[in-house]
Amino acid sequence: MTTSEDQTTPAHLDPKTYPRHLTDPTQNIHLELTYSPLNAQSALDKISSPAAGANVLFLGTTRNTFEDRAVSQLSYTAYPPLTLKTLAGIARDAVAKHGLTGIVIAHRLGVVPIREASIVIAVSSGHRRAAWRAGEEVLEICKEKAEIWKREEFVDGGMEWRENRERDGEGKKVVVSEN
């Protein structure tokens, strides 16, 4: 029989091996997976550019209810090498499609208390329309494709694992095809 002290945590799950970053300075792409609170100002600082006339920032925060059940906190897990690869593809596609001058995608892992941010999306572009569209599109694609799993923990003691893509931007259930 072994105790929890005898077992070693795999490196990809060990909070001591974080933060995980991926940066592409040629396209001003900044990606992060971290157990620490997310910093909105840091994200804005990274995308700031003299060529940018628009900076858009989105913070996804933990709310206190889900379908009339009181939520105590959320918890997120991921496989960082795969998740960062997916996020890099999303960021590169957004830069190319919308002509962005910068993009940050940062996601928190582990426990995220009520009112704290679990995701930061920050984008900059020459004009507002491209930035608005890119910010929303990046968020929706991250929820659909990024290998990040969420556990909702309820005040009544229950919990449920969810895929981010189970709900649309208005919180309505999405039917996911198995094909």
Swiss-Prot record:
One of its GO terms (cellular component) is molybdopterin synthase complex. Its EC number is 2.8.1.12. One of its GO terms (molecular function) is molybdopterin synthase activity. Substrate binds at H127, R128, K143, K150, R151, E152. It catalyses: 2 [molybdopterin-synthase sulfur-carrier protein]-C-terminal-Gly-aminoethanethioate + cyclic pyranopterin phosphate + H2O = molybdopterin + 2 [molybdopterin-synthase sulfur-carrier protein]-C-terminal Gly-Gly + 2 H(+). Pfam families: MoaE. Pathway: Cofactor biosynthesis; molybdopterin biosynthesis. Keywords: Cytoplasm, Molybdenum cofactor biosynthesis, Transferase. The keyword Cytoplasm applies. InterPro entries: MoaE_sf (IPR036563), MOCS2B_euk (IPR028888), Mopterin_biosynth_MoaE (IPR003448). Its main location: cytoplasm. This is Molybdopterin synthase catalytic subunit.
